[in-house]
Amino acid sequence: MKKNTVLAVVLSMLVFGGWLYIQQKYFPTEYNVPQKPVAQAQGQNPTSSEIAVQTSSNQISNSMIEAVADSDYPSREQTYVIETDIIRAVFTNKGGDIISYKLKEHASAGSDERVEMIENVTERNRALSLALGGHDAQAVDLLFNVKEESLSDGRKQIGFYRDIKLKNTDGSETVFTLAKRYTFIPGDYMFTLEVTIDGKEGMRGLSFGDSAYTLRSAPQIGPEWDKVNDKYEYRALSYFANEKKKEDRSITDGKTKAVNDLASWVSVSGKYFSFIIIPKDPIQKMFFSGIKEEGAKLHNSQFFISRQPIVGNAAYDQYRVYIGPSSEKILNSYNSAAANNYGYENLRIDSLAASSGFLAPLERVLKFVMEIFYKIIPNWGVALLLLTLLMRIIFFPLTKKSSEATKRMQELQPQINELQQKYKNNPQKLNAEMVKFYKEAGYNPASGCLPLLIQLPFLFAMFGLFNNYFEFRGASFIPGWIPDLSVGDSILKFGFTIPFLNWTDLRLLPIIYTASQLLHGKLTQTPGQSQQNPSMKIMIYFMPLFFFFLFYNAPSGLLLFWTFSNILMLLQQLIINKSMKK
């Protein structure tokens, strides 16, 4: 392999790896967008001296909550199912919480089971549980009355309500009705949650330290994933404040984080799905938790949002909840009032769709072109190959120029060797003579690397596109070999896991990819080069093997791009070599 080509490839890969690491760890994507002024937060900074304090602490246990005795309340836990055309939600009358939420149009990888969005549920921790007090207070665990209703416009509602009695610090009692009502619209992944606190006579507010109550997300979102084997999946806790999305992927394995910011929404999202809560009034106090529940396979990725103390004897709070795909097409609809059922403008939850960071505009252009190919041939694998072919054709002149520059360098190498030998003890003189020699020969030393470096932004953008594109999830290219472009291909399941490597399948794409890399290295190697420079020989074989292990479990869509791109480069190199011999 030619020295300049090797240097360019190595430099490209180092820059590529460094770019991925730095972007994910230190510079998560932030979106600057114009936004309407936000309203004052719920019960923000109450100053009334008439607030009855139930406890000065944010913590409150269920032993401090007394259910108002009534024979009409249920005596045992029951579950209720609400279904629309796209979701199936299971509720419990214990707290009025969600214990299962399945997406009917999306299957789990390698299974016909529908994606379960509520994971790690326990008796103490359910989705959209409400706790009186702060994030560390126990969720309300009382049995609620239930009312279900199907409205004439197709919406479905389920409500939970219960009278509750609390002891105040001054010895008095606070009695109120706690109600939660959910409203679902057909064809929409977003629904409404209304929380009502209706105080009885004599109620003078609700305060546990600096919170009235705390609402929580699911303990973990689905689909279930293996953190060790699926390195391309992730969980990120995010919120939107000061016209920016702020993201944190570090809340794992027991870590927690308190956040005090004025946020218009907060979410937990993965590569393909999101759980988002959008309150009517901005959130002021949040808490992120990555604790691991006993018996759970994976740590939680959970957020808590606290409401400010309630003044007076009643409060009504409204939340929109989105539990569904992180598809840019769907999430974008909440940026235009005419495109969604709730009149949202510029909500910017589309910022949760995975992208290439600062290269996102370039990624969108590539996505647009690929979607045109898909309309012509409705197969995402074929559309991917056609986009790769188009990019290789566009960059062929640059590839040819790089090869010609490398050949010219080989022709000048004898004279360069002479200069290096002549001035080996005088580096400054050698540099001056080399500059003079290149100028007289009409050769630019950067001409071999520069054309390859120009292609790097497109390479990064295509990497991000093929690794994260939502439509690849569940999209088949070749049935029996590549049934899902979002996961690795498979021609044989081992039935066990290979230690250290964590391989469970025999995959063909990584083998083809590595073979194409080796062939390309041999094709670009000049006669006798490996004998003259043994490090080149190591590079020819080491780099492909290194990437074989690195990409073995990569999504097949991503690896299909790399492999087909290598094959096209091989063909182009044959054409270039033939033209340069003439």
Curated annotation (Swiss-Prot):
Keywords noted in UniProt: Cell inner membrane, Cell membrane, Chaperone, Membrane, Protein transport, Transmembrane, Transmembrane helix, Transport
UniProt keyword Kinase present: no
Membrane topology term: Multi-pass membrane protein
Protein's UniProt name: Membrane protein insertase YidC
NCBIfam families xref list: PRK01318.2-2, yidC_nterm, yidC_oxa1_cterm
Transmembrane spans: 4-24, 376-396, 446-466, 542-562
Subcellular compartments: Cell inner membrane
Record's GO cellular component terms: plasma membrane
InterPro entries per UniProt: Membr_insert_YidC (IPR019998), Membr_insert_YidC_N (IPR028053), YidC/ALB3/OXA1/COX18 (IPR001708), YidC/Oxa/ALB_C (IPR028055), YidC_ALB_C (IPR047196), YidC_periplasmic_sf (IPR038221)
MF annotations from Gene Ontology: membrane insertase activity
Family, per entry: Belongs to the OXA1/ALB3/YidC family. Type 1 subfamily.
Function comment: Required for the insertion and/or proper folding and/or complex formation of integral membrane proteins into the membrane. Involved in integration of membrane proteins that insert both dependently and independently of the Sec translocase complex, as well as at least some lipoproteins. Aids folding of multispanning membrane proteins.
An example Gene Ontology biological process: protein transport
Subunit structure, interactors included: Interacts with the Sec translocase complex via SecD. Specifically interacts with transmembrane segments of nascent integral membrane proteins during membrane integration.
Main localization, broad class: membrane
Species the sequence originates in: Treponema denticola (strain ATCC 35405 / DSM 14222 / CIP 103919 / JCM 8153 / KCTC 15104)
